[in-house]
Amino acid sequence: MMIQSHPLLAAPLAVGDTIGFFSSSAPATVTAKNRFFRGVEFLQRKGFKLVSGKLTGKTDFYRSGTIKERAQEFNELVYNPDITCIMSTIGGDNSNSLLPFLDYDAIIANPKIIIGYSDTTALLAGIYAKTGLITFYGPALIPSFGEHPPLVDITYESFIKILTRKQSGIYTYTLPEKWSDESINWNENKILRPKKLYKNNCAFYGSGKVEGRVIGGNLNTLTGIWGSEWMPEILNGDILFIEDSRKSIATIERLFSMLKLNRVFDKVSAIILGKHELFDCAGSKRRPYEVLTEVLDGKQIPVLDGFDCSHTHPMLTLPLGVKLAIDFDNKNISITEQYLSTEK
């Protein structure tokens, strides 16, 4: 297996292409059937063809299959020449188990868009570390595209813009006006009631403009590959992107302190905190940003707090491994580097 010294780029997506989906951990095609079918039907209505991974509809208690079965499911989607985009169905807890069994040579020979979030971070980061392929922290089939309107439509708008756009010029994100982290209407056939929507509270703490390569994903998942050959090296000047879901404030302090003890904060030029879904503040009324500032202990690192690339809805799509620019004065975030190939 060769390891790329420069970014490897997948071909862009086009409406009408084929998306293959895999279940690298939780068996949600079984446990959340209604939401699964909603996600499938949503993408089909948008004009995409879908290929089911071999573990679709399968369950082995807490997971979709054995470690090697799950790795084989993913590899078979890589081998399929008809597939342009490989999408996670959902996260879980055990995607890191697959990393020794993925066919990295095949990924290099035929790079495809690989997208997902949460526990899929292990695959996104590990594949980038081993191949240089730019991967995408973005929607997964069941939680994201199984969501109801209007939030699913905003998620899709970012997904299609990022993955189909011509690779010229700078792309500046438009942050959604409203968001939600309510878990209602998860697997029901009918909407029980509309979700509570909150005004976007994304905040830019810092001044000037910071540019750097973005590295990261779901922080809790990154601890499962930390220190291994599948964890991308964090370099001086990188922008650290981290998000999490349903964690307690005690856990978040531990995770942020882990980063400090590993001297990550001595290297990064900025931090992006994704919105934290259903954060448990233990009655303190403190938010993850406040925990982070205490852990930083006076160290001045600009922070974009509450970026809409996380477990909340809607979700923006973020390429990992490319340069971002965060303008703290004008309060915007942009992709400044090519992240897809120019040829289909």
UniProtKB/Swiss-Prot annotation:
Keywords: Bacteriocin immunity, Hydrolase, Plasmid. One of its GO terms (biological process) is bacteriocin immunity. PANTHER family: CARBOXYPEPTIDASE VC_A0337-RELATED, MURAMOYLTETRAPEPTIDE CARBOXYPEPTIDASE. Involved in specific self-immunity to microcin C7. Belongs to the peptidase S66 family. CDD domains: Peptidase_S66_mccF_like. Pfam families: Peptidase_S66, Peptidase_S66C. This is Microcin C7 self-immunity protein MccF. The gene is mccF. GO terms for molecular function: hydrolase activity; identical protein binding. The keyword Transcription does not apply. It comes from the Bacteria. It comes from Escherichia coli.
